[in-house]
A protein has these predicted regions:
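Predominantly five- to eight-bladed beta-propeller fold
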Residues: 15, 21, 58-59, 94-99, ...
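Serine-hydrolase catalytic core recognition
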Residues: 18, 277, 410-719
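Signature of short aromatic-glycine-proline-rich micro-motifs recurring in repeat-based ectodomains
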Residues: 26-31, 75-81, 170-190, 270-271, ...
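Non-catalytic accessory segments flanking enzyme active sites
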Residues: 28-32, 43-52, 62-64, 78-79, ...
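Beta-strand C-termini and the immediately following turn/loop, strongest in propeller blades
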Residues: 41-47, 54, 82, 89-101, ...
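Short loop/turn segments that connect beta-strands within beta-propeller blades
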Residues: 55-58, 111-115, 150-153, 249-253, ...
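Blade-loop segments of beta-propeller domains
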Residues: 59-86, 91, 96, 122-127, ...
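Asp-box/WD-like beta-propeller blade repeats and closely related beta-sheet repeat scaffolds
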Residues: 101-148, 153-184
């Protein structure tokens, strides 16, 4: 009786609230450790100030920038970059996304002591503005060209940049998307030279997206006739950009071609500063992405020498480049060469000093190395695959855990490595930010999201239960499920499986970010409120279980992943409280691909499914991602035939496909071609298109509408 009255008093979740951010957590934003100090800077919650805080006390030290006090021509600051000497900062506003990681913005130079502000450059907004190590100059990209300025005089370094032809200092689309970076230049140690990657994409084939007037935002230029956005997108097996390396001498104003060996069709996925003014570090990768090399190149002579070669079976993960560190004395490189992702320490000449730590677990992030003490700070899935803790590895080989609570922990370390800001969460608790010393002791709580936690208790916010089962092939898989709040084990419930399933990904992770649409999995709890059990299982190919588990899908994407989702449906159907005739599946992007693969696997276990923005044949996807896991279509014809289009005649269950017409990542072509295959196979299905929306399908009321269609589809077909 009491339980019933409590449940009746609980407020009901609604999609409008979920998609409008009513359950969004509070963050400590823009955390930026100030180099060589125990201070960090952060943007205030109203975006009006950049404030410095003490790691030691957690207290505010100074206001570094104030929009009103500086009389800055902006409503709020969206981001900032401190100069290395701490005397100035770049602040930017009016940022506008280009692709996933890139943006253009209006940058300003602010002198902290003098409280003066000036525009970085006139004309087109700028990208990736970066201080020189001596704090005297700033390099940035505008209109595909590199510029440098001292705040008074601006020099244009390159002049051949042109949209869809030549790019200087920023990556092309596929490099940005798949090698995960947005700046392709680096200063040398004393700021006397600048090195960069030049992309000649003139011969790369173009893909065009059709644009309409639409709404929110309205594109009035397309009021009567649609327009197009055309850009260079290399598909699997096709030509990539031709890349070359260059340097600019700040004293002479001369440019020089740098000679760093790379295959004709290979990659330059990183360029980095070193402590030696006569050296930049350049990474190279072969097209198969199973051989990576680090070179030291002299920006004044153009000559290079190889330092490190990393070769592993099948492929090198992109995270190896993202997490590697070039320090003052050492280079730290992650590698799964022994079957798990671990850390390897080299000297600046490329000589291996030691393996930093070892065990049957994966290192998942690197936070830095204190070269004074030899301590190395990192994140790892050491307790289990769905847990993340922060650790320190000492020079003597001892590894200590610095975070205390199970769940997901990440860190931002101070410039002197004496303190860090810890961000912790788990399935049921939103983010908690605490300041800790480098022994792990909590000094102060910065944000605990108590208000959000209390709010979730006012709604039908269920509990995410974890489970493990073994497939008919003997594979042990981990999952979670959310049951209706009024769950009755004597009843039978329909089930919706959510999954992503892509290489190295994880959805079964003890974190507030886990769940189909973020916000603590609010959409999952909404579906549970509507009477469904929502479940998720990470199948073969997903991350944090070692190289063998992750790389077993190599050359046949979608084969094992779809089998594991079918096995998940069979397992769920065996539970006494599940209606095995009413099991559905859905996913976004790779999850959409695997939804289609699972619904055509051959065992008709799914009553309904929804595929959002799905790749339907990897010949249509980009070179870097696809070939990393599949090689080229010319080399792996049979592997590429493992796709939803080829098995459209096996598709079963009620199918809804949703796609944005302006998706620059997974092109609408994928859904167009798949729907034609379904038509010819005489299969019923429904399509839903979103005008001018990209891969994220958001803007205005779009996300609310999309989630309502997904919900209603499962309600109509399964209840």
């Amino acid at each position: 009786m009491m339980m019933a009255s409590v449940m009746q008093a609980a407020e009901k979740l609604d999609l409008k609230s979920i998609t409008s951010g009513a359950f969004s957590a509070s963050y400590v934003t823009g955390i930026n450790p100030i180099e060589g100090t125990d201070l960090y800077a952060s943007i205030s919650s109203d975006g009006k100030q950049v404030v410095s805080y003490s790691f030691k006390t957690g207290k505010q030290v100074a206001v570094l920038f104030d929009v009103e006090a500086a009389k800055a021509p902006m409503k709020s600051v969206e981001g900032y970059v401190m100069s290395p000497d701490g005397k100035k900062m770049l602040v930017f506003t009016k940022s506008k996304a280009v692709y996933r990681r890139s943006f253009k913005a209006e940058y300003f130079i602010y002198d902290i002591a003098r409280k003066t502000i000036k525009k970085l450059s006139e004309g087109e907004n700028q990208q990736v503005a970066t201080w020189s190590p001596d704090s005297r100059h700033i390099a940035f990209v505008k209109d595909n060209n590199i510029f440098v300025t001292d705040g008074e005089k601006e020099v244009q370094v390159t002049k051949d940049g042109k949209f869809n032809e030549v790019i200087n200092g920023i990556p092309d689309w596929v490099y940005e998307e798949e090698f995960a970076f947005n700046r392709a230049f680096a200063w040398n140690a004393d700021g006397t030279s600048l090195g960069w990657i030049r992309f000649d994409e003139s011969h790369v084939k173009t893909y065009s997206l059709q644009l309409f007037e639409g709404a929110k935002p309205t594109r009035s230029e397309f009021h009567d006739y649609p327009g197009e956005y055309s850009y260079k997108y290399p598909k699997a097996g096709q030509d990539n950009s031709k890349v070359s390396l260059w340097s600019y001498d700040m004293k002479t104003g001369k440019t020089l071609a740098l000679d760093v060996p790379v295959d004709v069709d290979g990659y330059y996925p990183r360029i980095k500063t070193t402590p030696d003014a006569n050296s930049l570090i350049v990474y190279t990768m072969n097209r198969h992405q199973d051989d990576m090399r680090l070179y030291s190149v002299n920006p004044f002579t153009g000559k290079s020498k190889q330092l490190i070669q990393e070769s592993v079976p099948k492929f090198i993960k992109e995270e190896v480049m993202e997490n590697s560190i070039v320090g003052k004395k050492n280079i730290l490189l992650p590698s799964d060469r022994d079957g798990y992702m671990h850390l390897y320490l080299y000297d600046m000449n490329g000589k291996l000093i030691r393996q930093v730590e070892k065990g049957n677990y994966d290192v998942t992030a690197i936070y830095g190395m204190d070269e004074k003490t030899g301590d190395i700070y990192f994140q790892a899935a050491m307790l289990n695959a769905h847990d993340r803790q922060v650790y320190v590895a000492h020079k003597n080989g001892k590894v200590e855990r610095l975070t205390s609570q199970e769940g997901s922990n990440s860190a931002y370390f101070s410039g002197d490595y004496r303190y860090f800001v810890n961000n912790w969460s788990n399935y049921s608790h939103p983010y908690v930010y605490t300041v800790r010393n480098n022994k792990g002791k909590v000094i102060k709580t910065l944000e605990d999201n108590k208000k959000l936690l209390e709010k979730t208790k006012q709604y039908n916010w269920g509990k995410r239960e974890t489970f493990t089962f073994t497939t008919s092939e003997g594979v042990k898989l981990d999952g979670w499920m959310v049951k209706p709040v009024d769950f009755d084990a004597s009843k039978k419930y329909p089930v919706i499986l959510f999954q992503y399933s892509g290489p190295g990904s994880q959805q079964v992770l003890n974190s507030w970010s886990t769940g189909s649409m973020g916000s603590g999995g609010a959409f999952d709890y909404y579906l549970a409120q509507e009477g469904f059990i929502v479940a998720c299982v990470d199948g073969r190919g997903t991350g944090a279980r070692g190289a063998e588990f992750e790389k077993c899908t190599y050359l046949r994407l979608g084969d094992l992943e779809s089998k594991d989702q079918v096995e998940t449906a069979l397992y769920m159907g065996s539970l006494p409280y599940v209606d095995k005739g009413n099991i559905g599946i859905w996913g976004w992007s790779y999850g959409g691909f695997n939804t289609l693969m699972s619904m055509s696997e051959g065992r008709p276990v799914f009553k309904a499914g929804v595929a959002v923005a799905p790749p339907t044949c990897y010949r249509f996807y980009d070179t870097v991602y696809t070939e990393r896991y599949m090689r080229t279509p010319q080399e792996n014809e049979e592997g590429y035939k493992v796709n939803p289009i080829e098995r459209a005649d096996k598709q079963h269950g009620a199918l809804l496909i949703c796609h944005g017409l302006a998706d620059d990542n997974v092109h609408p072509q994928n859904t167009f071609e798949y729907s034609e295959a379904l038509v010819q196979a005489d299969k019923d299905f429904k399509e839903l298109w979103y005008t001018n929306r990209n891969h994220g399908i958001s803007g205005g009321n779009t996300r609310n509408h999309l989630l309502r269609q997904i919900t209603n589809w499962f309600k109509d077909k399964m209840k």
